């Protein structure tokens, strides 16, 4: 099983409050690809196969709801996975003062399949807020699953690794 993750942040301007305090806006780009490289006849433990979806991968879909499908449309873990996300993060000012809040706009996409050529991405788009709380970062995202045609609220406390 091979899994590769990459994330980077790119400057996207600055937001300045009336008192001169400024913070950078940024674009966050993230991708994750994985593959189980074994003979087709090999029995792979289900814990080594891939599922994706949820607050940390493809928002707009429930946790681990994106996977390979049987002929009867049953979900199961697949041998190949790809996930990508682009998010614009912008500090929020209120009455001319910088706050501990940020707003975001994002697009996520992810796919899982048993053959790399069968990867069919599921896309989620949405908006959210981030709060640098005393106990750690709090994230609330409202996302639309394009293929599922469902709106989902995702809440998280803590850092993304």
Residue ranges and their predicted role:
Residues 118-130:
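A short alpha/beta connector and helix-capping loop motif
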Residues 143-148:
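A short, acidic, flexible beta-alpha connecting loop/helix-capping segment that sits on the rim
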Residues 69-71, 124, 140:
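Short structured motifs
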Residues 26, 137-139:
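Membrane-spanning beta-strand positions in outer-membrane beta-barrel proteins
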């Amino acid at each position: 099983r091979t899994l590769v993750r990459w994330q980077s942040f790119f400057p996207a301007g600055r937001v300045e409050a009336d008192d001169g305090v400024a913070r950078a806006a940024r674009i966050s780009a993230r991708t994750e690809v994985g593959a189980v490289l074994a003979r087709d006849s090999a029995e792979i433990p289900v814990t080594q196969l891939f599922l994706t979806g949820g607050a940390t991968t493809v928002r707009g879909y429930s946790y681990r709801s994106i996977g390979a499908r049987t002929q009867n449309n049953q979900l199961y873990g697949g041998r190949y996975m790809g996930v990508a996300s682009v998010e614009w993060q912008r500090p929020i000012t209120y009455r001319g003062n910088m706050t501990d809040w940020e707003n975001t706009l994002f697009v996520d996409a992810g796919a899982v399949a048993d053959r790399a050529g069968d990867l069919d991405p599921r896309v989620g788009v949405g908006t959210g807020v981030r709060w640098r709380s005393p106990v750690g970062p709090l994230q609330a995202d409202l996302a639309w699953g394009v293929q599922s045609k469902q709106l989902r609220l995702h809440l998280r406390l803590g850092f993304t690794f």
